[in-house]
């Protein structure tokens, strides 16, 4: 056999390679669609999907904890610091203000005792923060908007209010 002699064409091997390639591409597309559905199908770049998932998860966890009326644990989620009681004075939004905003007997709480919630909208802003809107106690009027900082993983009240398409 010389260098110019071509190997005999193997149709079965060629078909196996083609099926393997199509299988890999099909699996990748299915995995991509599954990830898109898992994070709430945002119309945003795929590399921001983790922000959607983690921000919605943090807001959900915060509101569930407030529903249980466990405000110290909810404040730990709010500030993303489980040991916040060791350095209470280092946070710009104090625990007392947080308890006034989310406490069931507070006059500053616009929603009363929080007994149920539903996350209805989530969008990223230009700076990369995520705004999550939640309906509290089945209200149909004004949702609670929380901003999630993807770098510090802290929640705050959002200065931006989103429109809700329902």
Task: Identify the residue ranges that each predicted region occupies.
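Short, low-complexity N-terminal intrinsically disordered segments enriched in polar/charged residues
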Residues: 5-68
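Short, flexible coil/linker elements and helix-boundary hinge sites characteristic
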Residues: 39-41, 102-103, 138, 153
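Short solvent-exposed beta->alpha transition segments
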Residues: 57, 61, 72-137
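Hydrophobic, Leu/Ile/Phe/Ala-enriched alpha-helical segments that form helix-helix packing faces
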Residues: 66, 102-106, 155
């Amino acid at each position: 056999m010389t260098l110019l002699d071509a190997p005999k064409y193997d149709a079965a091997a060629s078909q196996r390679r083609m099926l393997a390639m199509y299988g890999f591409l099909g699996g990748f597309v299915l995995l991509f669609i599954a990830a898109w559905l898992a994070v709430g199908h945002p119309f945003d770049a795929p590399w921001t999907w983790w922000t959607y998932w983690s921000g919605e998860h943090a807001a959900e966890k915060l509101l569930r904890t407030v529903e249980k009326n466990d405000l110290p644990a909810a404040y730990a989620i709010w500030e993303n610091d489980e040991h916040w009681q060791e350095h209470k004075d280092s946070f710009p939004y104090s625990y007392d203000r947080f308890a006034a905003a989310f406490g069931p007997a507070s006059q500053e709480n616009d929603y009363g005792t929080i007994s149920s919630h539903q996350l209805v909208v989530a969008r990223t802003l230009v700076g990369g923060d995520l705004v999550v809107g939640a309906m509290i106690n089945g209200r149909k009027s004004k949702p609670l908007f929380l901003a999630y900082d993807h770098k510090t993983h802290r929640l705050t009240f959002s200065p931006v209010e989103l429109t809700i398409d329902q």
